[in-house]
């Protein structure tokens, strides 16, 4: 992942001016051998229900106050979706995630990365909803289906 030179400065200023404890920025996805870049725009999330259907927060775009990470609020032991779980846990504490709609990060997507493993994504997606959000099997499968559809729309 690549940051623009002014990312930290602009994002910190955004957080201070808007009183956010955590924020993320827009980012572009750069795929190997592809000329067109896709930009995912950042938006502010006010509660965890807004983020449940699709993780639109790029890990390398996030800036947060250290105090948000605690024994009960940290990355879980998953191969994928660990960042998604953390953002949902933070939102469940009624902490808004600010969205700075400025493209300050480039994410290079590689075909052989963990992010590309469909089976692992499905497994971890189900675990996210069932174990960490404590949804029953049917609700977990429903949200996993919605997450999968939204993921396909991003491609």
Residue ranges, per PLM feature:
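Glycosyltransferase donor-binding loop in the core domain
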Residues: 3, 15, 79
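Active-site phosphate/pyrophosphate-handling residues
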Residues: 9, 13, 85, 127
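Hydrophobic/aromatic residue at the end of a short beta strand that borders the catalytic acidic motif
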Residues: 2-7, 29, 64, 82, ...
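Short, solvent-exposed loop/turn segments at secondary-structure junctions
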Residues: 1, 29-30, 69, 105
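Conserved nucleotide-sugar donor-binding catalytic segment
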Residues: 41-120
């Amino acid at each position: 992942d690549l940051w623009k030179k002014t990312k930290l400065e602009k994002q910190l200023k955004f957080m201070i001016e808007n009183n956010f404890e955590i924020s993320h920025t827009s980012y572009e996805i750069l795929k190997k051998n592809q000329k067109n870049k896709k930009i995912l725009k950042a938006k502010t999330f006010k509660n965890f229900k807004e983020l449940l259907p699709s993780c639109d927060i790029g890990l390398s775009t996030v800036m947060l106050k250290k105090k948000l990470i605690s024994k009960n609020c940290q990355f879980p032991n998953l191969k994928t979706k660990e960042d998604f779980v953390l953002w949902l846990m933070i939102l469940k504490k009624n902490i808004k995630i600010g969205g700075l709609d400025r493209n300050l990060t480039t994410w290079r997507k590689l075909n052989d990365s963990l992010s590309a493993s469909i089976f692992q994504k499905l497994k971890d997606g189900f675990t996210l909803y069932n174990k960490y959000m404590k949804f029953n099997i049917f609700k977990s499968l429903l949200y996993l289906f919605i997450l999968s559809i939204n993921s396909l729309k991003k491609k």
